[in-house]
């Protein structure tokens, strides 16, 4: 029986077609409209910053990749479908109950929809996915040589960094396209009768056989190409059974030859498949395909497994030594840990020291950091916020400046930003929120090595940071900070941008509108005069931003005039990531005064995920420490095999200008991106001396490097394989922490030069593998003349690590008893600050841990911690007292504290101590009531007891006997209670 004529679809009326077109138009508008608005807004934003070439380059690349990938994949699928249709049999036998006939009729009635729609949908999806790989495309197009060749194939590393990922991407897309073409070709032949399954054997037309066999043959050839590329990817392979990255003995001597054998087998199988075109016999290609699958199991998997178990493992150290050496060399180069960067030096770690030796380490002892930037933010907020809408981040930053005497000091710094979420009541009105409260005001710096006065008890004044302020006030810029600042207004910053509606409307439109500061009698207003901002004076711009932010006030508010501009995307790191989308930014952004301007400094990294023999590292895992976990500031979950701090970026806090500087002049990855986006990165020579003085070694890179140094400091392959000399990053000993101890920025004596000059450095202790004893001390220099140089002090013996030191300090009887008295009855909350490890004297290590106390036991914002004690440990001895000098004297004797920093006077001076005493009074003694009324005998006796206990406490304090001192404080508390209750 012949094929039935196709059933006709009912025609739509004109009105129905119109409604359908309108509905489709609305859907397209809803889907594409927001994206078009976003694209136009980004075009304006990039233009305002001077980086429109970045926007256009990325956009053009994405569009071209989308079109090419979509047309290639869609075209191949369309070809598979079209050829099957055009070569369909003229006559197809059928019967009444043939289910295929119904599908055939349906396909013929919707031929254009199916024939064009399916390939178009597949091509569209392929293009959307492919355009996200624009980075890989640009690296391939502009890639260059590294100047280093891999040890196995002798290819330049640029092949693995820039070419191999592109080849694998193209191969994947072609393979998927051909496979989909095979599937649609097979289905089309089945529907249109080229393949019939009726009867016991079925039937296959000659043209269907030709097409299907050809497509299968092409797939086999593509598999051969994949085997060829697999050989190069072996050099970046990881195995759980080996402690290093890259091709090992089994990979080189079994897997690689197996890949060559599989290539040959794949080519033979492809020939066998193509033979079916002429032989009309499917047994040969079937045998070939089965052979290929069995070979991949036997040759590709079985043989390497045998070699691994019988040859490599029994003699693993000797067999793998050459490849371990390759991995050590490659990993060190990929992560910037080569011999020209890292200097190793033996260090005793527990050498005895006397007071004179400690006193001569003035660069260290005068800069002992007392302020913990993760703890003192509430104090900044309490004393320097001023208004409810100003705010400081929960974690402050560390930078260095010269003090008035020209000494290098580290400072806890912060910009006083506007926090839109802190606005209340009418302040939240749209006009106030976006046109009045637009900016922060001020830069606050506190010397990290000192506090205002001594706080012997949380209820006494003292122990707070000393604030140096740059701020606009009384019509002028008050510049009391460590450097002069001409413009303290902050329009751009991480706090001000941390809101769902991050924009401010500024510009001259009548009277000054923006809140600036207050005097005793008036509120001063201000109008933004910077170059930043996108003009929104035209109705087109107002309409676009009304759609962008879903806010009708852009159209109807009179506060927007012809000179108005909008500031948005105000997060410094996000601005850098936008203009340099090829960078990975550091999680720490910090403010600095550079050339009298307030700027945010951001570190940018170039990374690769493929580098022969280099260990792959997860940035989120490597950079996670107790601080990152506590503040939920984890790095992106990105795996890298190569990283360089290639770019230093600044964002002006006033006008938002973004400037990128080349930091690493030898990074081949950066050179590629400088060719992709010419003119966007300034040469390293453009970094001014003022900016160089505030560049610091980046935290995230340092944390990645210290984790790798834990393994890759080992030179001997045998020792590396046995892991016997590995190190560990210590856990944070603070009982409230739950991750690794963070590295610390400090000013101390120069470890690199091994002299007593002051140096700004990023440091970390390292433990022995699975032990709590110290193995090493790592210091990375941030000084301009030695920037990036890393010094590793290797420590033998059983020197206490951070955990053991913290345990010894916190469990010391004098310390625990004293702090128990201070925190008695949960009246005060005790918090331990950062535990610093400081090399001092000739081969010694000093642990320093500040102690803070605040009223109550909660973490409430109203609880302002202040420094109340300083604890130290040297070897097995504990030093403890209200000041650095007290703790040093307790450890090393008189004279050790001669270089220690003094205490700045408080605004409200506490009662004076007895003459010659360097410690504050123990407590305020109750005085007799005024007037002629005499004390009762019992009350007089209680007062005498108080005075006697105070004398005992002072005597114990002078002697440094903190056990007796703590006992006296407890007796004093009891005596005061007795005095108050006595009639």
Curated annotation (Swiss-Prot):
Topology in membrane: Multi-pass membrane protein
InterPro entries from the UniProt entry: UPF0182 (IPR005372)
Signal peptide range in chain numbering: none
Transmembrane segments: 20-37, 63-85, 113-135, 169-191, 212-229, 260-277, 284-306
Main location: membrane
Entry's Gene Ontology cellular component terms: extracellular region; plasma membrane
Domain of life of the native organism: Bacteria
Record-stated family: Belongs to the UPF0182 family.
Protein name: UPF0182 protein ML0644
Taxonomic source organism: Mycobacterium leprae (strain TN)
Lineage of producing organism: Bacteria, Bacillati, Actinomycetota, Actinomycetes, Mycobacteriales
């Amino acid at each position: 029986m012949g094929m039935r004529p196709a059933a006709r679809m009912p025609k739509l009326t004109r009105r129905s077609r119109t409604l359908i077109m309108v509905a489709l138009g609305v859907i397209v508008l809803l889907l594409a409209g927001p994206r078009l608005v976003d694209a136009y807004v980004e075009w304006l934003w990039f233009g305002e910053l001077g980086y429109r070439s970045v926007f256009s380059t990325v956009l053009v690349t994405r569009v071209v990749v989308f079109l090419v990938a979509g047309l290639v994949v869609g075209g191949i699928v369309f070809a598979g479908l079209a050829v099957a249709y055009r070569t369909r049999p003229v006559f197809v036998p059928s019967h009444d109950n043939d289910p295929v006939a119904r599908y055939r009729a349906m396909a013929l009635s919707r031929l254009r929809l199916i024939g064009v729609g399916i390939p178009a949908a597949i091509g569209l999806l392929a293009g959307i996915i492919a355009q996200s790989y624009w980075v890989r495309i640009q690296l391939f197009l502009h890639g260059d040589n590294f100047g280093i060749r891999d040890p196995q194939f002798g290819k330049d590393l640029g092949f693995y960094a820039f070419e191999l990922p592109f080849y694998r991407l193209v191969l994947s897309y072609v393979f998927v396209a051909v496979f989909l073409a095979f599937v649609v070709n097979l289905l089309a032949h089945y529907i249109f009768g080229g393949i019939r399954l009726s009867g016991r054997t079925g039937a296959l037309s000659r043209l269907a056989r030709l097409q299907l066999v050809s497509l299968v043959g092409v797939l086999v050839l593509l598999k051969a190409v994949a085997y060829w590329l697999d050989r190069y990817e072996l050099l970046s392979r990881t195995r759980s059974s080996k402690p290093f990255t890259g091709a090992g003995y089994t990979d080189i001597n079994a897997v690689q030859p197996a890949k060559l054998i599989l290539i040959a087998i794949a080519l033979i199988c492809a020939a066998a498949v193509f033979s079916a075109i002429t032989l009309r016999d499917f047994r040969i290609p079937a045998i070939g395909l089965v052979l290929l699958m069995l070979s991949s199991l036997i040759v590709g998997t079985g043989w390497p497994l045998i070699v691994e178990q019988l040859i490599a493992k029994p003699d693993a150290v000797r067999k793998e030594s050459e490849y371990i050496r390759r991995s050590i060399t490659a990993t060190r180069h990929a992560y910037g840990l080569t011999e020209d960067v890292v200097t190793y030096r033996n260090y005793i770690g527990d050498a005895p020291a006397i007071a004179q030796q400690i006193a001569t380490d003035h660069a260290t002892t005068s800069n002992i950091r007392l302020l913990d930037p993760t703890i003192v933010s509430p104090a900044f907020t309490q004393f320097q916020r001023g208004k409810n809408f100003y705010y400081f981040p929960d974690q402050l930053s560390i930078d260095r400046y010269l003090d008035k005497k020209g000494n290098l000091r580290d400072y806890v710094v912060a910009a006083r930003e506007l926090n839109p979420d802190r606005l209340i009541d009418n302040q939240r009105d749209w006009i106030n929120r976006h046109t009045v409260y637009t900016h922060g005001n001020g830069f606050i710096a506190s010397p990290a090595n000192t506090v205002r006065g001594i706080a012997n008890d949380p209820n006494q004044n003292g122990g707070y940071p000393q604030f140096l302020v740059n701020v606009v006030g009384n019509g002028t810029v008050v510049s009391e900070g460590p450097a002069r600042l001409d413009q303290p207004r902050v329009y751009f910053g991480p706090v001000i941008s941390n809101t769902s509606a991050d924009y401010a409307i500024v510009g001259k439109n009548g009277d000054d509108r923006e809140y600036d500061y207050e005097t005793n009698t008036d509120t001063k207003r201000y109008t933004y005069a910077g170059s930043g901002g996108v003009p929104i004076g035209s109705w087109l711009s107002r309409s676009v931003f009304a759609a962008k932010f879903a806010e009708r006030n852009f159209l109807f508010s009179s506060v927007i005039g012809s000179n108005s501009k909008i500031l948005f995307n105000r997060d410094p790191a996000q601005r850098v990531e936008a203009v340099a989308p090829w960078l990975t930014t550091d999680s720490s952004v910090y403010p600095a005064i550079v050339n009298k301007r307030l700027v945010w400094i951001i570190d940018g990294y170039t990374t690769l995920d493929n580098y022969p023999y280099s260990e792959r590292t997860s940035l989120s895992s490597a950079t996670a420490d107790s601080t990152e976990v506590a503040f939920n500031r984890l790095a992106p979950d990105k795996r890298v095999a190569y990283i360089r701090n290639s770019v230093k970026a600044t964002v002006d806090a006033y006008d938002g200008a973004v400037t990128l500087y080349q930091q690493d002049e030898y990074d081949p990855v950066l050179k590629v991106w400088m060719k992709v986006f010419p003119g966007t990165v300034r040469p390293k020579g453009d970094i001014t001396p003022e900016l160089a003085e505030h560049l610091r070694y980046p935290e995230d890179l340092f944390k990645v490097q210290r984790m790798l140094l834990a393994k890759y400091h080992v030179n001997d392959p045998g020792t590396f394989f046995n892991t016997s000399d590995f190190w560990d990053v210590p856990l944070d000993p603070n009982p409230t922490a739950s991750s690794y101890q963070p590295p610390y920025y400090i000013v101390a004596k120069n470890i690199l030069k091994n002299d007593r000059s002051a140096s700004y450095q990023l440091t970390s202790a390292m433990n022995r593998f699975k032990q709590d004893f110290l193995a090493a001390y790592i210091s990375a220099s941030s000084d301009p003349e030695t920037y990036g140089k890393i010094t590793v002090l290797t420590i033998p013996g059983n020197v206490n690590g951070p955990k053991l030191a913290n345990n010894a300090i916190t469990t010391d009887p004098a310390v625990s008893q004293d702090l128990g008295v201070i925190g008695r009855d949960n009246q005060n909350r005790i918090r331990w600050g950062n535990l610093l490890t400081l090399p001092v004297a000739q081969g010694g290590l000093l642990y320093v841990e500040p102690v803070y106390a605040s009223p109550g036991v909660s973490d409430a914002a109203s609880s302002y911690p202040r420094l109340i004690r300083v604890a130290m440990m040297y070897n097995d001895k504990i030093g403890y007292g209200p000041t650095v000098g007290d703790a040093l004297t307790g450890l090393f004797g008189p004279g050790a504290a001669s270089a220690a920093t003094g205490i700045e006077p408080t605004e409200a001076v506490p009662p004076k101590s007895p003459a010659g005493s360097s410690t504050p009074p123990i407590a305020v003694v109750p005085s007799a009531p005024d007037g002629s009324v005499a004390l009762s005998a019992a009350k007089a006796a209680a007062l005498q007891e108080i005075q006697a206990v105070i004398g005992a406490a002072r005597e114990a304090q002078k002697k440094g006997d903190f056990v007796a001192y703590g006992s006296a404080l407890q007796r004093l508390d009891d005596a005061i209670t007795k005095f108050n209750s006595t009639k």
